[in-house]
Amino acid sequence: MPGVPREVIEHRLAVRPGARPVRQKLRRPAPERQAFIREEVARLLEAGFIREVIHPEWLANPVVVPKANGKLRMCIDYTDLNKACPKDPYPLPRIDQIVDSTAGCDLLCFLDAYSGYHQIRMAREDEEKTAFITPIGTYCYTTMPFGLKNAGPTFQRTTRISLGSQIGRNVEAYVDDLVVKTRNQETLLLDLAETFENLRSARIKLNPDKCVFGVPAGKLLGFLVSARGIEANPEKIRAIERMRPPASLGMCNASLAVWPP
């Protein structure tokens, strides 16, 4: 996948001068998770997102975590590398303002970037700092991996560069969460055409299976939004309704700790 051109943006690691590289020792996860790591490494190699590396100074371990849908995801434990990098001060938008801005929009389009972070390349001189160790070898990322301290601000910069003329007008973006907001059906296609043209210019690809177009309501950053504003999320309501009533004073106190007055 070609991804965003380097001249537009690439992810750099501003490692503090004098920071000592850390090489984590190989961890041995359960056999089924080792098998999943092997599959992920093969997939990432084929996609060109990682490459083999020899004698890296920094070395981290992969971690397998469950996703909301029950499937597994391989992340890298960049705790040590992240400690050596100062926080990027680039501002992220306020979630409440993004959510509130969708009120009054009759139709919404929710867009999902295909392998979002991997569409941004790592700076070549920083690739080997992302190295990780597995039972079958050591690898580093050629694209921006999930888990790096400042990956979010870098992606926010990317959306600001590509959609800057639209943000606040007919598009809102929080890192890789994008929503096209349309006041009425007559302008829907115009708003989408403008968005697609800008994304195409930046070579940002979308995942059509995860995009939703022209709907009156949908989930955005954990909220259910519509033309009326924020609405109660049915999934969260069901979770509360399914809770067992407290059967002891201790359980009552625990409930009060979760929902303080």
Question: What do these predicted regions represent?
Answer:
Residues 1-261:
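Retroelement reverse transcriptase polymerase core
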